[in-house]
Amino acid sequence: MRSITAIVCLLIAGATTVQAQQNPYDVALIPKDLLSYSSAVVRDKEVSIDVKDLENTVYHIKEVVTILNKNGDNMAHIVVNHDKNISIKNIKGIVYNSFGIQTSKFSESNFEDINTTDGFSLFEDVKIKRYTPEVTDYPYTIEYEYEQRIKGSLIFPDWRPNAETGVSVEKSSYTFICNPDFNIRYKEINIPTTVNITTDKNGLKTYTWQLSNLKAVKYEPFSPNPENYLSIVKIAPEKFSYYGIDGSFTNWNELGKWEYDNLIANRQELSDETINRVKEMTGGINDPKLKAKKIYEYMQGRTHYVSVQVGIGGYQPFLASDVDKLNYGDCKALVNYTQSLLKAVDIESYYCVVEGNQRKISLLADFSSMNQGNHIILCLPFKNDTTWCDCTSQTIPFGYLGSFTDDRNVLACTPNGGKLLHTPKYSTQNNLQHRSANFNIDEQGELTGDMITNFTGVNYTDREGIIHESPSERVKIMQEIYRINNMNIEKLEFKQDKSLQPVTTESIKIKAPEFASVDNGKIYFLLNPVNRILVTPKIIYNRATDVYINEGIIEEDEISYTLPAGYHLENKPEHRNIERPFGKYIATMKIEGNQLIYNRKFELINGTYSKDTYQDLVDFYQSVVDADSHNVILAKNN
């Protein structure tokens, strides 16, 4: 009996020892509810910001994240910026396998050190160190930490515990430490807890946010901006020093004033020669808007965009006189230069900070901070006709913004302070793609004919990338766009009307042998070969987010087929009319003599809709897919 008892005790002791020795980053230890919808799990993340004084801040991060599959790989990419005012200390890390067993180590020597070249970034003088673990066996875990020492106290990174959809969080914390006389403002967005503020005996203040067991938010098609439902804390100082420049702000007016006075003013001087040239060039134009258009096109014709590493932390534009001499600049420099040219003929304009993104991300009206916005555009406040310009493109029309910067709050930096303005919205009716096609089909099934398509509103730039390609590459791309069987392009032209209501026109002449199938005296072909919706949104059960349509559009197609003599339409003409709160679809066909005439209209209406309408949206798209797949059967007359 004693021996049996001893064995049992040994087994229990052994099991306890194995459990105690289990590696802390073993994937098996992740709570099961954190695996649902997850591609990555943040096991532990500690972010601390220690403001020593106005001119010295220490930023420290330590993170352990488990990558469950390749969709989570970006969470293992480590990117750390640095420049002459930001130094990196003690950067290191470890990679573990699924059992939490170390497989490799890395240090600063393993990082690639590169210059940033993002064409729309405001941080273009910043270098980055980048590291990506070479791991192909999933799951794996990466642990890393580093410290940045920053000369200044203007910009603090947001805390985003679940940085994106598909990421769950076991534990995450954000600690902000500062002296008694250093005051901050903060904004909590979708945070289930609130800040804990403590003060030690020396008056040192500590703000702490903590989260644990945060489930992943699954990706859902047609979802709103992630900032509407992911967790974020934003922090901004009241007083600060930025690379030797002191300042303070508690609202957008004060921040815009500081930016104008310290980063923009006194950088708009031009030579007398340039000023006289601009005055002479616009001398015969009385309308201020047309005068500004002339100047904008002059700027486009003599400059080109480059990523320039210059200025105070990437925020200060080149001198206008330098751009005038060198004929290049970044987004800041080209806006500043255009402002200077306009100023020469007494046209007022505003230097505006915007968040450039296909999603409409506005600067927060109730919370000002320097790290909102990544691009600069120009505003011309004409009376009852405010006009906006993006100065980084040498091809887009005067007054055109497009979907990258339309319909959002921006900060105008003026001598009188900052103003929150809103860029214009391109309405659904403006965003039109209208196509007219005239085709012939012969008895052998060959299709010949031509199409003309006009693009307006946000669609104006739909062919922008193609226009500047070589003729052979243009043809190749158009064959991908128009998936017509055996299509040969005999002629292809693009024209751009760059008036105040710009239009891109595409003209194409095609020939497609054996486009239609011929069998036993009948001809079969796809009614709509030029503009079909081919896929439906994924079915989502228990949807969590509202349905969001970012941009409203209208597509109109008019196709006329001349049918071969001696044939008639065998199948019944197709008519579809589908209408929902978020969209419409109308398709009709009719016979007029030897003409088969097909008309199609597809409309999406931008806006936010209840999550309960998502299945209606899926059904709507499925109905459109079915309608767009309609086949025509022509039969020979008896």
For each feature predicted by the language model, list its residue ranges:
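Bacterial Sec-dependent N-terminal signal peptides
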Residues: M1-P24
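A sensor for short, sequence-defined functional sites
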Residues: Q21-N638
